[in-house]
C-alpha cells in the first residue's frame, strides 16, 4: 500500500519537471533537486565536494580517519547502503522513507541491470541519473553534470578547471619522460596484494609516468591480486607505494624486504588518506591531489612543487578545510615515519 501511494504521488510531482542530461546523454525529468541519494561512495564524495547540502543519505558510516574531516550534519544522515563493491545493495525501505528527488547511479549499475534495481525499489518513479566515475577523467567530467543538477555550476567549473590543469600537467610531463621508474603498489598487511598495470585502481601510476611492475589483467573487478614475495623480489621495484599503515610500519625492519631497491634507498611511501584516499579504495576526486603528489615523488627534478602548500590549497578548495601542519602530517603518514 505504501509503495502504491508513493508511486501515485511521484507521478503527480513529475508532471512539471525540469530536464537534465546524465553522462550517457539520456534526458532525465526532475521537478526539483533538494535531496539526492548517491548510490556509490565515489559519486557521494563528488557530490559532497560540490554541494553537500543536497545529500540525503550515506552508503556506510564514515570510519575514524574519514569522520575527522567530515561535516557534522553529514555524519548524522541515515545509512542507506548502495550498489557498489562485492554485491552490496541498499535498504530499499530506507530509500522510500527519505524520498530522494533523484538517485545517482554508477556506470557499473547501468551495465548490470537497471530493471533489477527498479524491481528492488518496487518500480517507484524516482529518476535515475547515471554518472561515470571509474577513472579520474570520468570523475573530473562528472563535476559539470553534478554542478548543473545541484544548480552549482560555477563551483563545479572551478573544481573542474583545477583538476584538468593537474591532468594536463601530467600529460605534458609524460612527453618528456625517457625512463619510467619501476613502481610496486603494496596492499594488505603483508604488502602482498597489488593491482595489475591495466587496472583502473592503479591508473595514477600510469598517469604519473611510472611503470607498474605487475603486468596482467585483473582476475576480478574488485582487484587486490595476490602475489608472493619472490615475485616482488624479481620485480625489484625502485618505488613502493603502501596502502596500509601496518605494512608501512614494518617494511624497513623486515629482513627479506631489505633486498629490494626501494627499501634499500628509502623509497617506500605511505599513500595519504583523509578523509579519503589520495590514490584508491575508494576512488574519489582526491586522486587529483594524489596525482600531483605522485608526480612529485616519481619526477621530483621535473615536477617541483611544495606538496604541503598544494595539499592545503586543495583541501580548502574541495573540502572547505583549513589544515594545520599536524593534520597534514597525519594524513600523509609522516607521523609514522
Where are these regions (language model features)?
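Structured C-terminal subdomain patch of bacterial secreted/periplasmic proteins
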Residues: 135-148, 248-337
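Bacterial Sec-exported substrate-binding components of ABC uptake systems
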Residues: 14-46, 153-186, 297, 302-337
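A short, structured surface patch at a secondary-structure boundary
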Residues: 43-97, 102-109, 210-213
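Extracytoplasmic ligand-binding site segments that recognize negatively charged/polar headgroups
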Residues: 65-66, 86-87, 107-116, 131-145, ...
